[in-house]
Amino acid sequence: MNKALIPAIMGLTFAAAVAAEIPITGNVESKCIVTTDANGVYGNPTPSLLSTTQANGGVEPVVRYDVIQADYYKALISVPDVFTESPALNDVVNWSGDVTVGEVSDPLMSAYDNDKRLYNNITEIDLTVAGSTWFKISSEADYGYDKAFPAGQYRSVVTAECIAN
């Protein structure tokens, strides 16, 4: 009788010792893609103003959002509020800017202009329609009070992100 129990006990011991952990992995790719369509250029219509608007000789940057699945993402687009490169400035720069819908792949996306939320220098838009939206960003920098910007290279940056809800 003992001889029959020994193999059974050994079998249970070996079964417990042979346990394994099996990993499960996965990669998630965003269903929202952000692409730069056009870089911006500052025009200098007056000595104290730098502007990306076409009327002022500039070029507005354009960012495209491609949304594969609607209602899961929001766009966060920041307009510049500082130069990342410039000559030394000894006075205040007053910044303004806006984010507007340019082109759309679905007419319902034109509502994004009315539904956006603004805080600090950030525009937040719920991406409620699948497809592509092109956002134009305007930026103006006004230097001091009747002061001319010093000659040199000026650079600022627009940040565009797609955030999962």
Model-flagged regions — what are they?
Residues 1-19:
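Gram-negative bacterial Sec-dependent N-terminal signal peptides
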Residues 10-13, 81, 105-108, 126:
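N-terminal regions of proteins, emphasizing targeting and processing segments when present
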Residues 16-17, 99, 108, 113:
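Intrinsically disordered, low-complexity serine/threonine-rich segments
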Residues 18-94, 124-165:
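N-terminal small/polar-rich segments of proteins
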Residues 93-104:
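Short, surface-exposed beta-strand/strand-loop-strand elements in extracellular ectodomains
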Residues 107-128:
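Extended, solvent-exposed segments with strong compositional bias
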